[in-house]
Amino acid sequence: NRGHSCVKGRFAWGYANHADRVQSPMIRDSIDEPWREVTWEEAFAHTAAKLRSIQERHGTGAIGGITSSRCTNEETFLVQKLIRSVFGNNNVDTCARVCHSPTGYGLKTTFGTSAGTQDFDSVEHTDVAIVIGANPTDGHPVFASRLKKRLRQGAKLIVIDPRRIDLVRTPHVEAAHHLALRPGTNVAVLTAMAHVIVTEGLVDEAFVRERCDWDAFEDWAAFVADARHAPEAVELLTGVPA
């Protein structure tokens, strides 16, 4: 981290010490009623009764459990034990299967490793950085601090995001380009960029031949070179001026 705080270290104190933080269990029987504080014993009994009534009404499989990717192995084990032993079914999942597993598979298939192919130090050697669909200042302040340092040294930044994130313009840092695309058109914008790279002869052929499947690359290059993928052709879709 080199002296910089991570997300939890930088922001966790805000909600941990917030005056509105709930510190005791509360129950209400309807949305129109105010919350009332109860003991932990009453809270557990109330929750158990509600879960039991759901199964009685809708069947054993009506309840499942899903854990966070930030749970420890022990916590995840306890959740699956609860679902199987107490609720009597196998409806157990984890959000990592939805978010990280597809990412890892895609990275492995494309780049040969299921993790990022660069390290934080690489940003210190970049001349142009592209930030797409991310807000490093809030989501990863350690990396954002190092990126801002490099930008202050003269590197250029391209932000591709519908939002005007902090990096678009902040003290001593300003993006050279902000492509405020319409939500959901990321692929179209990236394909249009690839179209320009391929059709204007900007491909580093030696690099691609060394590191990629050249036959597959040629198939892809022919696809993105189609006039349908030109920046002018997708401008109305993406909202990004050609």
Protein language model regions, located:
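N-terminal export/assembly segments and adjacent metallocofactor-ligating motifs
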Residues: N1-E200, D215, W220, P241-A242
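Histidine-acidic residue clusters that define the catalytic metal-binding segment
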Residues: R36, H229-L237, P241-A242
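Internal, active-site/partner-interface "lid" segment
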Residues: G201-V234
